[in-house]
C-alpha cells in the first residue's frame, strides 16, 4: 500500500474511532458502568474517580451496583452520584449502592437515534474530506509530471474504494447503535 493511501486510511480510521467513542457515550436502554467514569468522589480531601474506589457492576439491564472497597466512604460516593448530571438517586443499604435507571421513552429513543445519525453524518463528511484531500494531492502529482494520467485514475479509484469501505463501516456502526437504542 502506498504512502498516500496509508495516510488516508489512518485518517479515515481515526474518524471512525472518534465516531465509536462518541456513540459509546450515548446511553441506550442498558445501564453501563462506563456511565459512572466521569464521577469524582472526595476521598480524604482528594477528588478521585469513582471506579478507583468501588466495584461497579450491572446485574440487570437498568441497574448498576456500586460496591465501595472502603464502606466508610459510601455516603461520600452517594453524594457524588447525586451531584452528577445523571439524574439518578442511589439507594443505599449501608454496604452497596443501587442505581436504577428509568426506562427510555419512545420519544427519547427517537431523539437519540437522530443524534446518532447526526454524529454519523459528521464522520462521513470527515471521510469525504480526506478523500478530497487525497485526490487533490494525486492531481497535483499529475500536474507536476510525477505520475501519468492513467496512474492518477488508478490512484483515484483506490482512494474511492477506501472511502466506500469506511462509509460502509460507519453505516454498520450506526445500524448497531440504532438497534441497541430501539431495543426495549
From Swiss-Prot:
GO terms for cellular component: cytoplasm. The keyword Protein biosynthesis applies. GO terms for biological process: translational termination. Keywords: Cytoplasm, Protein biosynthesis. InterPro entries: Ribosome_recyc_fac (IPR002661), Ribosome_recyc_fac_dom (IPR023584), RRF_sf (IPR036191). It is found in: Cytoplasm. Its main location: cytoplasm. One of its GO terms (molecular function) is ribosomal large subunit binding. It holds the Pfam family RRF. Belongs to the RRF family. Responsible for the release of ribosomes from messenger RNA at the termination of protein biosynthesis. May increase the efficiency of translation by recycling ribosomes from one round of translation to another. This is Ribosome-recycling factor. It comes from Thermoanaerobacter pseudethanolicus (strain ATCC 33223 / 39E).
Amino acid at each position: 500500500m502506498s504512502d498516500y493511501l496509508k495516510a488516508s486510511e489512518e485518517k479515515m480510521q481515526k474518524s471512525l474511532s472518534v465516531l465509536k467513542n462518541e456513540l459509546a457515550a450515548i446511553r441506550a436502554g442498558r445501564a453501563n458502568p462506563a456511565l459512572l467514569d466521569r464521577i469524582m468522589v472526595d476521598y480524604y480531601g482528594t477528588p478521585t474517580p469513582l471506579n478507583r474506589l468501588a466495584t461497579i457492576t450491572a446485574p440487570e439491564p437498568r441497574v448498576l451496583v456500586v460496591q465501595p472497597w472502603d464502606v466508610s466512604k459510601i455516603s461520600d460516593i452517594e453524594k457524588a452520584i447525586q451531584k452528577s448530571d445523571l439524574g439518578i438517586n442511589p439507594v443505599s443499604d449501608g454496604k452497596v449502592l443501587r442505581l436504577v435507571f428509568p426506562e427510555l421513552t419512545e420519544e427519547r429513543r427517537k431523539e437519540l437515534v437522530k443524534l446518532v445519525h447526526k454524529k454519523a453524518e459528521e464522520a462521513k463528511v470527515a471521510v469525504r474530506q480526506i478523500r478530497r484531500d487525497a485526490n487533490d494531492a494525486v492531481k497535483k502529482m499529475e500536474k507536476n509530471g510525477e505520475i501519468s494520467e492513467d496512474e492518477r485514475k488508478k490512484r483515484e479509484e483506490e482512494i474511492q474504494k477506501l472511502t466506500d469501505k469506511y462509509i460502509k463501516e460507519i453505516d454498520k456502526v450506526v445500524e448497531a447503535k440504532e438497534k441497541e437504542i430501539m431495543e426495549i
